[in-house]
């Protein structure tokens, strides 16, 4: 499927779980080949994957989705070392190697109170939720190329936020 897509000489190649069903050796070979072709032909590539080890290896920027909503977008290295959105923290805590976890400041508390009704899509599971989260979905806040959709980063919250949470 990847070879057929490349025959069309696209400007953008979308790879949705493109190597997830391959064994480790074949997967490495296909990824190496794909990354080389993408670089040589100057094709933009969008990888969609649940595999954070893969994302760390191949991506320059990463976007994290929660229930179809963009929760956070940043340079991959920055996002893995210092995630801002509570869901990104939980996601990475579940899959990151111990050396990266040690470098991180703190783990996020997780609560499970069922699904959210309006407001923030992560409200029912967030350990940092506030009253405003229940009623209003957060905007996407942009900080010099890094974006996060969380009320913790609204102007009124930034001034008084817990210094241990970034």
At which residue positions do the language-model features occur?
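Conserved catalytic motifs of ABC-family nucleotide-binding domains
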Residues: 9
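Generic detector of low-complexity/intrinsically disordered segments
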Residues: 14-15, 154
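Short catalytic/signature loops enriched in Gly
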Residues: 73-166
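Generic detector of short, locally flexible boundary/turn motifs and exposed helical patches
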Residues: 12, 27-29, 113-119
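P-loop NTP-binding/switch modules centered on Walker-like glycine-rich loops
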Residues: 14, 21-103
């Amino acid at each position: 499927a990847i070879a057929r897509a490349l025959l069309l000489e696209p400007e953008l190649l979308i790879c949705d779980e493109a190597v997830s069903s391959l064994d480790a050796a074949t997967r490495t070979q296909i990824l190496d080949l794909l990354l080389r072709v993408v670089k040589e032909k100057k094709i933009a590539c969008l990888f969609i994957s649940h595999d954070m080890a893969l994302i760390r290896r191949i991506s320059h920027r990463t976007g994290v989705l929660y229930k179809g909503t963009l929760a956070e977008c940043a340079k991959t290295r920055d996002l893995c070392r210092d995630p801002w959105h509570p869901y990104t923290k939980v996601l990475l805590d579940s899959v990151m190697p111990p050396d990266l976890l040690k470098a991180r400041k703190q783990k996020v508390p997780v609560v499970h109170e069922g699904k959210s009704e309006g407001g923030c899509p992560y409200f029912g599971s967030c350990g940092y939720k506030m009253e405003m989260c229940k009623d209003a979905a957060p905007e996407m806040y942009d900080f010099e190329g890094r974006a996060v959709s969380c009320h913790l980063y609204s102007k009124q919250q930034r001034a008084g936020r817990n210094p241990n949470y970034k």
